[in-house]
């Protein structure tokens, strides 16, 4: 299937025989109920013995000159609707390659494949069913396989490829793919390094990376990192012209003392012409680094070597006449005392900080103890108040009960007196009535 599609993509040089027969042949369409039975008979008797021969002769003859097929649609040089022509494949490769480069030679996503399918289907001379993103992706895979086959054939000595899309794919995914160059200057140690495309083989990528790293690194970067200053020594300072001592200009770092800057190079200028040769550049740089390190050690030793006046005077005698005068002894002693005081001050600061922390801890502890005592006192007061409240409540309850009982007793007594009075009054009334009746009877 892949070979068939690759053959169709090369053009109309080898069309599909099943879809469009070549010129010179005649295509005959026969409609019959069943497969006819043919027999080997002479040409003269074929019309008499075979009744289907007349029907074959009367049917219309169709040539293969790009006419219509059995369904009435134009063939257009192809039989299948999903076959790819050379023009469609070219448009597909261009659209895919553009997005492939935009993604830094990465894989396309579904939206990119849909855009590619729309571009392929929107051609002016396109009259078939629109291509889908899946068809475009499968076609690209087929073209890549064809490209790999061509590469293998060329590697085996097959000569230059005649495939029309070979050069285009070789520029996109081959080893000859162009790498974007730097458009701006070097901005740092690795500022000129750019992203290397992943389509390049691993060996080429590593070599290119090392070349760019070497080109982006300044020549004196390592030396500057070692001595902390710019140390560019011209070759003329060590030239073997045989002249006087110290011929040539030297750019010495300003961090080196004047005596060290003057004496070593004067000695070097006097000794090298006697030898009659020049040192290599690497050896010169090594000597320069050594002198700078010795000068730094000398400066550090000079700063700390002020224990006695004799040592300070010896250090002062080592200086040359063109150096600056050393500071007075009293000033140096004051500086050392100030440094010691500064050191003591740092220790005092730490001690003061420790004391402040201790004082803060003590104050915090006292505050917590006071809070705890206050809570205990408040709890005692609360218990005392509750006890007094309960006592008052009991007293009030007892007093209330006593008053209620007294009221009940008084009410009972009052009710008894009332009943006695009523009985006596009734009795008196009866006696009065009886007396009245007796009086009436007597009258």
Swiss-Prot record:
It is found in: Nucleus. Residues 84-144 form the Myb-like domain. Residues 333-350 have a biased composition (Basic and acidic residues). One of its GO terms (cellular component) is nucleus. GO terms for biological process: embryo development ending in seed dormancy; regulation of DNA-templated transcription; seed maturation. It holds the Pfam family Myb_DNA-bind_4. It comes from the Eukaryota. The keyword ATP-binding does not apply. InterPro entries: ASIL1/2-like, Myb_DNA-bind_4. GO terms for molecular function: DNA-binding transcription factor activity; transcription cis-regulatory region binding. Residues 38-48 have a biased composition (Polar residues). Residues 360-414 form a coiled coil. A motif (Bipartite nuclear localization signal) lies at residues 290-303. Disruption phenotype: No visible phenotype under normal growth conditions. Keywords: Coiled coil, DNA-binding, Nucleus, Repressor, Transcription, Transcription regulation. Residues 1-82, 238-350, 413-443 are annotated as: Disordered. Residues 64-78, 239-249 have a biased composition (Gly residues). Residues 271-286, 428-443 have a biased composition (Low complexity). Transcription regulator that may repress the maturation program during early embryogenesis. This is Trihelix transcription factor ASIL2.
């Amino acid at each position: 299937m892949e070979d068939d599609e690759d053959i169709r993509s090369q053009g109309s040089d080898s069309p599909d025989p099943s879809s469009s027969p070549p010129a010179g042949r005649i295509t005959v369409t026969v409609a019959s109920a069943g497969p006819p039975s043919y027999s080997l008979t002479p040409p003269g008797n074929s019309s008499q013995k075979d009744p289907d021969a007349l029907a074959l002769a009367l049917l219309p003859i169709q040539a293969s000159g790009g006419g219509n097929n059995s369904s009435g649609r134009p063939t257009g040089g192809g039989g299948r609707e999903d076959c790819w022509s050379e023009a469609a494949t070219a448009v597909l490769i261009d659209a895919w390659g553009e997005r492939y480069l935009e993604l830094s030679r990465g894989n396309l996503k579904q939206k990119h494949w849909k855009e590619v399918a729309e571009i392929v289907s929107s051609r002016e001379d396109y009259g078939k069913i629109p291509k889908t993103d899946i068809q475009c992706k499968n076609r690209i895979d087929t073209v890549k396989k064809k490209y790999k086959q061509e590469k293998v054939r060329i590697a085996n000595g097959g000569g230059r490829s005649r495939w029309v899309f070979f050069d285009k794919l070789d520029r996109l995914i081959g080893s000859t793919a162009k790498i974007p160059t730097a458009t701006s200057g070097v901005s740092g140690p690795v500022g000129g390094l750019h992203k290397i495309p992943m389509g390049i083989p691993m060996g080429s990528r590593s070599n290119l990376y090392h070349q760019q790293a070497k080109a982006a690194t300044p020549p004196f970067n390592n030396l500057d990192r070692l001595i902390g200053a710019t140390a560019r020594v011209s070759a003329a300072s060590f030239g073997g012209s045989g002249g006087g001592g110290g011929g040539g200009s030297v750019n010495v770092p300003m961090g080196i003392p004047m005596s060290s800057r003057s004496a070593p190079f004067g000695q070097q200028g006097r000794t090298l012409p006697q030898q009659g040769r020049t040192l290599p550049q690497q050896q010169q740089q090594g000597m320069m680094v050594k002198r700078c390190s010795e000068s730094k050690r000398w400066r550090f030793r000079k700063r700390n070597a002020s224990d006695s006046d004799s040592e300070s005077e010896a250090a002062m005698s080592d200086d040359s006449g063109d150096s600056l005068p050393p500071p007075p002894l009293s000033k140096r002693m004051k500086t050392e005392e100030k440094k010691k005081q500064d050191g003591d001050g740092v220790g005092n600061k730490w001690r003061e900080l420790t004391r402040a922390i201790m004082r803060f801890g003590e104050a915090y502890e006292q505050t917590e103890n006071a809070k705890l005592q206050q809570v205990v006192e408040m709890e005692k007061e609360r218990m005392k108040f509750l006890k007094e409240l309960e006592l008052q409540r009991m007293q009030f309850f007892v007093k209330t009960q006593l008053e209620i009982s007294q009221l009940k007793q008084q009410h009972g007594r009052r009710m008894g007196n009332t009943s006695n009075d009523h009985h006596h009054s009734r009795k008196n009334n009866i006696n009065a009535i009886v007396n009245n009746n007796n009086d009436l009877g007597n009258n």
